[in-house]
Design a protein with these regions (language model features):
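Hydrophobic alpha-helical transmembrane segments
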Residues: 1-77, 85, 89-91, 101-126
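Short basic (Lys/Arg) and small-residue
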Residues: 96
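Active-site-proximal acidic segments at structured loop/helix or strand boundaries
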Residues: 82
Length: 126
């Protein structure tokens, strides 16, 4: 039996943004690690303001923060999908979850290195 392809109803930009903010809200409430990343981001922003880093370094720091938070949201989305698919032990789902967690770790380490280099350079030249 051939079914026509699924065609979602057109949505307004307001609805799309509402759903996106809902997703961020769910990510913050559902994941304690997301809150840790937000606290770390606040510390980084405060330290960058205190050290008066230049606009290029601000851009790098904010990009790193955004990448880590986005990776955490993707990880959360994969976790929600895995729970919806199967509650039993499943090697493929476990691998997907581990890879997603690895992506968060890689972005977090990269962000820490970038932040460390920026702050170390600023602290040693001030």
């Amino acid at each position: 039996m051939n079914l026509p392809p699924y065609q979602p109803a057109p949505r307004t930009w307001i609805a799309k943004f509402r759903d996106a903010f809902r997703g961020i809200y769910i990510g913050v409430r559902a994941q304690s690690s997301f809150v840790v990343h937000l606290i770390t981001a606040a510390v980084v922003v405060g330290l960058a303001a205190y050290l008066r880093v230049d606009v290029i370094r601000w851009s790098l720091l904010l990009l790193c923060i955004a990448l880590v938070l986005a990776a955490e949201l993707f990880n959360s989305a994969i976790e929600w999908l895995a729970k919806a698919i199967d509650h039993a032990e499943n090697e493929h789902l476990r691998n997907a979850l581990d890879v997603a967690s690895g992506a968060v770790l890689v972005t977090s380490i990269g962000a820490a290195i970038v932040g460390g280099l920026i702050f170390l350079e600023r602290l040693t030249t001030t």
